[in-house]
Amino acid sequence: MDNKEIIQEVIKAFDNSDVETILRHVTDDIVWEMRDDKGMVVRGKENLLNFFSEYNEMKMVGTTKDHIIVDVDQVAVDGIVKMKGKDAVPFEMYYCDIYELKEGKISKMISYVNKKL
């Protein structure tokens, strides 16, 4: 599986809330930086699992993938994500995710998100 295929599988797993598949594709020392108004950073596979458990009330409704750009061990994806929060009110966000891979696993994710007005 090449890096683009790995990221496409991970994106599909995010779309389907398939945490097991996501965790299978990340390193034990994964770092996920969310560069939004909260500025959250998740470090390590165990903390990533805890993050997904904590935010399980957020449901993915749909996404677009406008671009998938691959440069050796870095992959960038952008588009629009449609979600429902714990209040069940739908909302949309623009996103750009940058993935860094080492030996076929994601070692770092940087997510830029901005709520669509």
Write out the residue ranges for each language-model feature.
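Solvent-exposed, amphipathic alpha-helical segments
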Residues: I6-A13
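Outer-membrane beta-barrel domain signature
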Residues: V26, K38-G39
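Short aromatic/basic micro-patch
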Residues: V42
